[in-house]
Regions:
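Conserved mixed alpha/beta catalytic, RNA-binding, or beta-rich assembly cores of soluble enzyme
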Residues: 1-304
Length: 304
């Protein structure tokens, strides 16, 4: 597996740059331990070298940022954005999805398997560059790349293109570090009279200002963020999971999640509560010390 192009993304809250020249960890990880990360990689203690090993595993294991990237549509996590979008597309709950893929940028597709194959093990992509083989595969599977010449990531323009293509019920992912895009999509939605389901993802690095935008999403993943749990989770109508909770913030989001759960094969526990978010001490990620100190005042009621 050989890396092509240049790409930046977040992994465990660390900013990472990957290119033909190798893997560079640009910032320290914000997370010391994550149960989901351990389950997927076998890595318990997260530091700079652990982040490097994680990326190396992605490159070697499924060709992350490589010409021969593997596209597998098997489910990876129970409540993932791509898993849910795959289901919604298959059941016609939404008509198309606007997602992001390394080597391609913003992608518009009606193919649920393609959404899952792109997103199943993807990190929060900050910027990427074109990988022709990835673009060719996506287009061969019926996907439309927003800008094949630059691999531009622009979810607002992606939603616009989806609407111009005739779709009225659109699902879109928005990464937490670009949360202001959520507000822009809401403004666009009102103007074009479409129904846009916004799924907020990759929220480990979110600050309080970004959280104000995330509240406008339909569904939000808490990732490893105490701020999201505190500021966004308190607005939730429904919560999925405890370790890495996912919040339904609107009736539309709640109904889509309930549709997904109606077809879910594993056993479930459902109970009523007077207050969200629901948390259990010792069940969530462990943040690095400097992140803990930043969150201590606004999130002291949230227990990991």
């Amino acid at each position: 597996m050989y890396i092509k192009g240049e790409h930046e993304f977040y992994c465990c809250g660390a900013r990472v740059k990957i290119s033909e020249g190798g893997i560079k960890i640009l910032t320290e990880p914000l997370v010391k331990y994550c149960p989901l990360h351990e389950a997927l990689t076998g890595i318990k203690k997260i530091d700079v070298e652990a982040v490097r090993r994680t990326i190396e595993m992605k490159v070697k294991g499924f060709g992350f940022c490589c010409a021969n990237r593997l596209f597998k549509a098997d489910p990876v996590v129970a409540y993932g954005a791509s898993e849910m979008m795959q289901f919604w597309l298959e059941k016609k709950n939404v008509e198309c999805a606007v997602v992001v893929c390394e080597g391609a940028g913003t992608v518009i597709t009606t193919n649920g398997n393609l959404v899952q194959a792109i997103g199943s093990r993807l990190n929060g992509i900050i910027k990427t560059s074109p990988i022709p083989e990835i673009i060719q595969y996506i287009e061969g599977m019926g996907g439309k790349v927003l800008d094949a010449s630059t691999a531009k990531i622009d979810q607002v323009e992606g939603v616009e293109k989806a609407f111009e293509s005739g779709f009225k019920r659109i699902a879109v992912t928005v990464a937490g570090f670009k949360a202001d895009v959520i507000s822009k999509i809401r403004s666009l939605e009102a103007g074009i009279k479409a129904e846009v389901t916004i799924f907020s993802v990759c929220n480990t690095c979110v600050d309080s200002e970004k959280a104000e935008h995330i509240i406008k999403a339909d569904i939000a993943c808490a990732s490893a963020s105490k701020i999201v749990r505190s500021k966004v989770g308190g607005k939730a109508l429904l919560q999925l999971g405890v370790t890495i909770p996912v919040y339904a913030l609107t009736e539309r989001g709640k109904n889509l999640i309930l549709a997904y759960l109606a077809d879910f094969k594993d056993k479930l526990v459902v109970f009523r509560t007077g207050k969200l978010p629901y948390s259990a001490e010792g069940r969530g990620p462990v943040l690095s010390e400097h992140v803990k100190s930043c969150c201590s005042n606004c999130c002291e009621d949230i227990k990991f």
